[in-house]
């Protein structure tokens, strides 16, 4: 079974390093160009902008399959003079942010560039509003795209040191999505851009939340304009907390952890796609607390089977507590019968591969993939087309 798991990981889950590097270079070069153009379109954005955080499963090392989808956070910073105050809301995992000295901030000489902040970002009583933030971000992305040459009514063109790319866009959830293609029309990737606000450790939530495990090296966290499950009022006041930088350190340097996560994600894609990938990552964050470092150095078979059983225990209990605030049950919105069915399905798979380890491939792979597996095809080696010659030069991103 060990050989089968390693083979599946190599041929159906993990991309060759050169393909990963190529898409990463294209992404970062296009985003660098696009963000610089965004700064020219809105002085307020230029003043607020701190950095881009390259988040999501690709940069965590947990991506399954082709690197065609990326999650990027556009981190914005509110000056301390405005006295931003974060308060835990009545929904675990969500906070409210209020500016207690907005007018004093705006009266400062350097505050002039922020004169439209209230109109564009704040609701009643100077609370930061998710709806206004999303609309501002949508408008800014549209305005930036309009500065680029248009190929047709839906596609514009961006040129940088890696070549010429076609970009279109659409809106989904809290993200603005950029679709990036080669000028030939061949799709490269979709990039979700989310405007977030970043805060330092002195604003870290306290009541019911874990303390920062890396206060000196990773002191910052984000708030994201994502609404809670279920009805809340006022809707625009709720911001989701994000501790992605700390999570990345927690899962790093644990030998078999990332391959095991990717195998379970591969299984969920086939058998229970209604469980979000982040929930699986959260389960592993809880498991990390219970295991010492030596556990992750065991065989992939043992780590995979152990973590799969523990993952199924969370599903059977119908609760995956948010790692940073246990009161927030990440799967609380799913129907009990749905979770029972998922747990029973995973339980059957566990028993089957315990009795017949060679059956693991049938459970992890689709019918088409299994046929290719039997035929010995290396699917991931052919997952991405080669870059055009003009984009395979020795350009270095500075």
From Swiss-Prot:
Mn(2+) binds at residues 288-289, 292. It comes from the Eukaryota. Gene3D superfamilies: 1.10.1410.40, 3.30.460.90. Signal peptide: none annotated. GO terms for biological process: defense response to virus; immune response involved in response to exogenous dsRNA; innate immune response. Its EC number is 2.7.7.86. GTP binds at residues 192, 240-247. ATP binds at residues 57, 69-71, 244-247, 265, 277-281. It catalyses: GTP + ATP = 2',3'-cGAMP + 2 diphosphate; GTP + ATP = pppGp(2'-5')A + diphosphate; pppGp(2'-5')A = 2',3'-cGAMP + diphosphate. Its cofactor is Mg(2+); Mn(2+). One of its GO terms (molecular function) is GTP binding. Keywords: Antiviral defense, ATP-binding, GTP-binding, Immunity, Innate immunity, Magnesium, Manganese, Metal-binding, Nucleotide-binding, Nucleotidyltransferase, RNA-binding, Transferase. It is an enzyme of class 2 (transferase). Mg(2+) binds at residues 69, 71, 192. The enzyme activity is specifically activated by double-stranded RNA (dsRNA). InterPro entries: Mab-21-like_nuc_Trfase (IPR046903), Mab-21_HhH/H2TH-like (IPR046906), MAB21L/cGLR (IPR024810). Belongs to the mab-21 family. Nucleotidyltransferase that catalyzes the formation of cyclic GMP-AMP (2',3'-cGAMP) from ATP and GTP and plays a key role in innate immunity. Acts as a key sensor of double-stranded RNA (dsRNA), the presence of dsRNA in the cytoplasm being a danger signal that triggers the immune responses. Directly binds dsRNA, activating the nucleotidyltransferase activity, leading to synthesis of 2',3'-cGAMP, a second messenger that binds to and activates Sting, thereby triggering the antiviral immune response via activation of the NF-kappa-B transcription factor Rel (Relish). PANTHER family: CELL FATE DETERMINING PROTEIN MAB21-RELATED, CYCLIC GMP-AMP SYNTHASE-LIKE PROTEIN-RELATED. This is Cyclic GMP-AMP synthase-like receptor.
């Amino acid at each position: 079974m060990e050989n089968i798991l390693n083979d599946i990981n190599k041929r159906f889950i993990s991309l060759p390093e050169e393909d990963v590097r190529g898409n990463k270079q294209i992404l970062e070069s296009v985003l660098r160009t696009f963000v610089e153009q965004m700064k020219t379109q809105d002085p307020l954005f230029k003043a607020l902008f701190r950095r881009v955080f390259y988040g999501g499963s690709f940069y965590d090392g947990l991506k399954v399959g082709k690197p065609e989808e990326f999650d990027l956070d556009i981190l914005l910073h509110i000056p301390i003079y405005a006295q931003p105050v974060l308060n835990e809301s009545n929904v675990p995992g969500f906070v409210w942010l209020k500016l207690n000295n907005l007018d004093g901030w705006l009266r400062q000489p350097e505050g002039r560039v922020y004169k439209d902040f209230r109109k564009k970002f704040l609701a009643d009583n100077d609370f930061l509003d998710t709806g206004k933030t999303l609309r501002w971000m949508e408008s800014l992305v549209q305005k930036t795209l309009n500065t680029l040459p248009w190929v047709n009514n839906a596609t514009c063109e961006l040129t940088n040191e890696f070549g010429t790319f076609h970009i279109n866009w659409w809106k989904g959830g809290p993200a603005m999505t950029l679709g990036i293609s080669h000028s030939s029309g061949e799709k490269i990737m979709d990039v979700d851009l989310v405007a977030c606000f970043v805060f330092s450790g002195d604003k870290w939530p306290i009541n019911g939340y874990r303390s920062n495990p890396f206060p000196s090296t990773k002191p910052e966290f984000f708030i994201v304009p994502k609404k809670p499950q279920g009805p809340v009022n006022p809707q625009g006041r709720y911001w989701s907390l994000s501790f992605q930088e700390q999570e990345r350190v927690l899962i790093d340097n644990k030998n078999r952890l990332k391959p095991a996560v990717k195998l379970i994600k591969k299984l969920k894609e086939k058998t229970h796609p209604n469980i979000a990938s982040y929930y699986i990552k959260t389960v592993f964050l809880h498991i990390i607390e219970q295991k010492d470092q030596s556990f992750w150095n065991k065989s992939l078979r043992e780590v995979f089977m152990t973590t799969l059983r523990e993952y199924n225990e969370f599903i059977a209990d119908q609760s995956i507590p948010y790692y940073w605030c246990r009161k927030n049950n990440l799967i609380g919105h799913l129907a009990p019968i749905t979770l029972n069915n998922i747990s029973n399905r995973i339980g059957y798979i566990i028993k089957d591969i315990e009795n017949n380890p060679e059956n693991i491939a049938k459970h992890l792979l689709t019918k088409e993939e299994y046929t290719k597996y039997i035929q010995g095809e290396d699917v991931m080696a052919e997952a991405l087309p080669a870059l055009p010659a003009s984009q395979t030069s020795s350009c270095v991103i500075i």
